[in-house]
Amino acid sequence: MINLKKYIPEGSRDILFEECTIKNNIENILRNSYINVGYEEVRSPTLEFYDVYNLENQPISQEKMYKLFDNTGRILVLRPDMTTPIARICATKLKNRVYPLKLSYTGNIYRMNKALNGKISEITQSGIEILGFSSLKADAEVIITAIKAILKTGLKNFKIEIGQVEFFKSIISDTALKEQDTEKLRNFIENKNFSKVEEFILRNSDLIGETSSKVLMNLPNLFGGKEVIEKAEQLTSNKQAIEALKKVRDLYDIVKRAGFGEYILIDLGMVQHINYYTGLIFRGYAHGIGDDLLSGGRYDKLLGQFGYDIPATGLAINVDNLVAALDDCVRENLYSRDRYVVFASSCNIEKAYEAVSKLNSEGKRAEVSLFDNIEETKKYCIENKISKIFNADTGKTIVEENYYGQK
């Protein structure tokens, strides 16, 4: 048997030095952004009972959950999602609070992936939820809050798509498709597989009908700005579908009027987890990353499964993908190389610690040199790209940033 003590499990990773500092700073920026606009932070345990996630229409399959047993044989899981524990907390501990309730969180989730697919199994999410409020203002609020928070991290090149599962459901309700066939079609549309969509509709035209076929055939192409809504309206007379489109238009208008229209798009072909989400859905992308920057939507039925039937909406930002999307200039700002190493001879060691304390109080990073002479201290700074040396013996900075800040 191979000894694995020097290895880590597939899908996990060690985060070191600069990357760790940048990630921590991003988490703090997001966290403070939420708190500053009225969100209260909560934390749920990493371990939850499997029953918490064994729900009707749960979007995360049990095959993706890491499972283990407690000392009484009960099944536990490493939480694969943050929203479901929020629903549990709200239904069991927060019934007497004033609603709407605005909650935020930052934490790791764990999802098992197929072998050798290159995906991370431990993901850091930072998210917000608004519970107990069905107004469109709540959906707009979470999108606007997320946009503002992401902008504060320094990321500018990103988009958030708005979808509407009720539009797809309304069109499907006019067909005679069985649930299994509906799921196949949904998957083709979600993945923008145009040829498969066309093939499926032609093969099942007698069950779908001419009017619905026209809408469903165009659904993968209904992507872009506000004009997408007008195109969709011209394709159907279904009243529920028209009402669903109105919500998309109204949400788009609110976000645009708030000054963030350049960051949003509409994608009516975004139809993931149609039995979990109950209306508007959101998904964010950033230049240079293949996976979602954020995801979320309205999930009015979730809390009812915990015995507390109230509406809810929210989203989660993938912190790891956000960090990966940052350009070098932003990363430099998040990981300052303006550091000091304070040197002092052995007889003046107390001066070194006094100098470090003073520099720290001024908001500067500083550390005491562990070396016995200044030459070894200089070498240490060059190798670690530390910008300045402060000599506590002389009270002078003897290494300039322009020289020792570059290797």
Swiss-Prot record:
Pathway: Amino-acid biosynthesis; L-histidine biosynthesis; L-histidine from 5-phospho-alpha-D-ribose 1-diphosphate: step 1/9. InterPro entries: aa-tRNA-synth_II (IPR006195), aa-tRNA-synth_II/BPL/LPL (IPR045864), HisRS-like_core (IPR041715), HisRS/HisZ (IPR004516), HisZ (IPR004517). GO terms for biological process: histidyl-tRNA aminoacylation; L-histidine biosynthetic process. The keyword Cytoplasm applies. Its main location: cytoplasm. One of its GO terms (cellular component) is cytoplasm. SUPFAM superfamilies: Class II aaRS and biotin synthetases. Keywords: Amino-acid biosynthesis, Cytoplasm, Histidine biosynthesis. One of its GO terms (molecular function) is histidine-tRNA ligase activity. Transmembrane segments: none annotated. It is found in: Cytoplasm. Heteromultimer composed of HisG and HisZ subunits. Required for the first step of histidine biosynthesis. May allow the feedback regulation of ATP phosphoribosyltransferase activity by histidine. This is ATP phosphoribosyltransferase regulatory subunit.
